[in-house]
Amino acid sequence: MQQNTLKLLLKVLGRKLLVNFLKYKKYFRKTSLKQENIGEQFLIEVASKKPKNFLEIGVFHGVTARNVCELLYNIHKDDFKYVGLDLFGESAENSEEIIPNTKFNNPLKKIYFKYVLKVDPYSLEAVKKLLKKFKNNIHLIQGNSNNILHKIDMSKIDYVFLDGGHAYNTVKNDLTNL
């Protein structure tokens, strides 16, 4: 990790908050930022920009959303907005998209979500539950970015995390609409 980045973050967040957010939490769910230190590097990047209006395309299980909301809350308190756009499950509308593997390999996670929480971890409902602490700061949109992204006022967005559909036309559309 670069020394200048750490100094900047220490100045922005203070020692206690810096130590707290350097650990990317997985909340007993799947995440695309699972490789060692990738989640931490991502949070450092976001913290260095201090966005107040964050857009995530491709929310998946909501792990990155929760980490980002925790970070933005530590920086701005309640003065931030998080917008998350995702398919939140398979449907006829998104049958052509490449859907990430939503199955858990760990049988305890299967039991936990199916019988304890009684919710599909990939559903809009499950992500809302994970983010309920920030219910006044979040706006989750269910749908395909090919049809919805152009309706979002990008002039109000400070930071975009693009991790949605991986099909060529979807990526091209997302980049064009940003």
Residue ranges of model-derived segments:
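Membrane-proximal basic amphipathic "stem/tether" segments
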Residues: M1-K34
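S-adenosylmethionine/decaboxylated-SAM
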Residues: Y27-K30, Q35-L178
